[in-house]
Every structure is written in structure tokens, then in C-alpha cells.
Regions:
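Alpha/beta-hydrolase superfamily serine-hydrolase fold, recognizing
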Residues: 1-217
């Protein structure tokens, strides 16, 4: 927050299996409505709200934004999605790209089963890769950060391509050598990832974006 000069709200949202979909999703929508209504009281501005999420959180804010578009609600200024799950259908072990991590596959599969006990994985609010071009039209600017050694890398880049084809100003960066969750764990690639996020926030504030790490692709 200090480095970006921004006000940060870190949401401790309720999770599955105690609260499966759509509980957390609807909780997020209600929370954002509250923040918009009380932005000045919190020290921010309702006209400059940026949503950021990592992994499941990135999936959540993407689905929320699709809902804003469908309902004609005020859109966030932009999104920052870090290694987002974009396709919850199929077997995780069959996903291409990254390093096959048995432990992550097991944990992710369990998480999906808890979040969606009754199925519905092809719902675009859950698997944004299935959103149509019409559903994506008008999507706000978005930065998608992926990790090279992550089974979610390919689907996130495919979703970025779908956004671009729908006319979205999208920036997609893959951090070489990084694994899923590298930002909070502060493992390889976290400095590059943090620099990209700070640079993108400045872009959303003044329209000037530069890639601080040319080696990142």
C-alpha cells in the first residue's frame, strides 16, 4: 500500500466446504457495493476501485466483473488477476503446461469438489474461459500474471487471448521460473511480480505503463 500510494482492503472471505458457491460469490458482490457506498469514509474513491485476486480470489473477481457487465453495474477501474483458475472442468492432471505437481493437483481437485458440490463447472462465473465474446465485451482493463511452472498457466493465457479478442485492454505476463502462489510465498519471481503490479497500478492511475522487467514474457 505504501509503495503504490493506494488504499488496500484485504478481504477475509468465507470459503468452502462450509460455504460453497454461490455464497462467497454473492458475499463479494455485497462487499463491493458496501465499499462503493463508503469509499470516502474509508479514505478512498468509489471512482477508482481496482480488484485484485490471487488464485481462487482472481477467479472470484473475474466472475464478479462478468456479473457487473450483465447487470449494467458500475465496473471497477481495472483488475489484477494472479495465476487465476479459468477452467474448472476436466481433470487437473490432464492440463498442459507447467510442471505436473501431484500435491497441487490433489489439493486443487479437493477444493473444486468442496466449492462446487453440485457441479456446474461450465458456468462462466466459475470457469470464465467459457464466457462468450459478447459476455466479455466491455470488460475493464486487466493484468493477468501467470507462473511458468503452474498447471493453470495455459488456461489463464488463453483467457487473456479471449479478452483481447473481445476488445479488452489486457496485459498478460508469465513469470519465468515461478510456481503457483509465488507472490505471498515470496519465492522465485515474487520481486518481478510485485514490480509488475505496482507498474500496472500506476498505469491505471495515469495511463502510463512500462514493463519493468523486459525478460518477463
Amino acid at each position: 500500500a505504501y509503495r503504490s500510494g493506494s488504499l488496500y482492503l484485504d478481504v477475509d472471505y468465507k470459503t468452502a466446504p462450509e460455504h460453497p458457491f454461490p455464497y462467497t460469490f454473492e458475499e463479494g458482490l455485497d462487499l463491493l457495493s458496501y465499499v462503493e457506498s463508503h469509499a470516502e469514509d474509508l479514505g478512498g474513491s468509489k471512482d477508482n476501485l481496482v480488484l485484485m485476486g490471487q488464485s481462487a480470489g482472481a477467479n472470484l473477481i473475474t466472475g464478479m466483473t462478468l456479473t457487473f457487465l450483465e447487470e449494467g453495474r458500475k465496473l471497477p477501474t481495472g483488475l489484477i488477476c494472479c495465476y487465476p483458475p479459468c477452467d474448472l472442468t476436466g481433470k487437473l492432471a490432464d492440463k498442459k503446461g507447467g510442471i505436473k505437481d501431484p500435491r497441487m493437483i490433489e489439493v486443487a481437485s479437493f477444493g473444486i469438489a468442496c466449492y462446487l458440490p453440485h457441479g456446474g463447472t461450465e458456468n462462466p462465473l466459475i470457469s470464465p474461459l467459457f464466457a462468450s465474446k459478447d459476455q466479455l465485451k466491455g470488460f475493464p482493463p486487466v493484468l493477468i500474471i501467470t507462473a511458468e511452472h503452474d498447471i493453470l498457466c495455459d488456461e489463464a493465457l488463453t483467457f487473456a487471448r479471449h479478452l483481447a479478442e473481445a476488445g479488452t485492454a489486457v496485459t498478460a505476463k508469465t513469470i519465468l521460473g515461478a510456481r503457483h502462489g509465488f507472490l505471498p510465498r515470496r519465492t522465485e519471481g515474487h520481486e518481478e511480480g510485485e514490480a509488475l503490479i505496482l507498474s500496472y497500478l500506476r498505469f491505471l492511475q495515469n495511463g502510463q505503463y512500462t514493463n519493468p522487467f523486459p525478460s518477463v514474457c
